Amino acid sequence: MAIAWMDSYTRWAADFRGEHLRSWMRDHTEVPAVAVVLYLILVLYVPENVMAHRNPIKLRFLNMLWNLLLTVFSICGAYYCLPRLWEVLTSPRISGLMADPNLGPNAPPPKLPGSFYNSACAWNDKIFFDGFVGLWVAAFVLSKIPEMIDTVFLVFQKKPVIFLHWYHHATVMLFCWHAYAYTISSGLWFATMNYCVHSIMYFYYFMCACGMRKVIRPIAPLITMMQILQMVAGTLIVLYTYVKKQFMGEFCAVNNPSLRMGLLMYVSYLFLFSQLYYRSYISPAAARTLRMANGEKKGK
């Protein structure tokens, strides 16, 4: 049965075409709009009006399964996307490219060398829009709606939902939907970075849900630092594509709204994650909390 399932998956993934999903997403812009409205109701209304006088719901086991699922999902995404990004960056000739249909049925595929410019600006459906990598980039985009379930666990367990948490979930979902629907040549960068960071982040959450928070707590600053580095890289990539297209007049397959939204999004994330890191690990209050925790351990 497992072999049959893998054969079906292999055929389906190999035949995946991103254009079909892109057309559907363009025709259904109400989906992210409805999702974000329901999400804001969850964040801004439910804690004070539904859960205020109720006891926290015990969801530890479901939370464990959820974080384990997202860990495996992120690892699978990184498995497919990271090697392709490396090839698009370094290969003498990017493999599997599609010939331009406007040049006729016998036109040869383009000879596109790997480079940072081509990884950020070049467009060919076979780079990361079709096939196995295309499927996992599409899965990355679509996963931003179910990932909001992270917040469901916080709300119904009556745990704090900080601004960074819900702002990040809402805005990244809206940006990913728009960027995929209207083409973004740097999308492989964003998907790969997110998959890699989330592989570690959700494993950390899984271990915490298993009751091992004290054991794994020392890597928490590392995870936040990885997120900050992701935002630095994202900001630089958006700036690079913006300069190439707007100031140097070079081709870059990303529309202007995506450039503006991407820059605003990444800069705001960089500020908020840096602020979180300072408040959690550097500020005097964080230092006092750490000293108290160490004192408690010594006392025990």
Curated annotation (Swiss-Prot):
The active site is at H168 (nucleophile). It comes from the Eukaryota. PROSITE patterns: ELO. Its main location: endoplasmic reticulum. A motif (HxxHH motif) lies at residues 165-169. The chain crosses the membrane at residues 31-51, 61-81, 127-147, 170-190, 192-212, 219-239, 261-283. Keywords: Endoplasmic reticulum, Fatty acid biosynthesis, Fatty acid metabolism, Lipid biosynthesis, Lipid metabolism, Membrane, Transferase, Transmembrane, Transmembrane helix. Pathway: Lipid metabolism; fatty acid biosynthesis. One of its GO terms (molecular function) is fatty acid elongase activity. Its EC number is 2.3.1.-. It is a multi-pass membrane protein. InterPro entries: ELO_CS (IPR030457), ELO_fam (IPR002076). Pfam families: ELO. It catalyses: an acyl-CoA + malonyl-CoA + H(+) = a 3-oxoacyl-CoA + CO2 + CoA. One of its GO terms (biological process) is sphingolipid biosynthetic process. One of its GO terms (cellular component) is endoplasmic reticulum membrane. It is found in: Endoplasmic reticulum membrane. Involved in the synthesis of fatty acids. Elongates C14 fatty acids to C18. Required for the maintenance of the global lipidome profile in this parasite. Belongs to the ELO family. This is Fatty acid elongase 3. It comes from Trypanosoma cruzi (strain CL Brener).
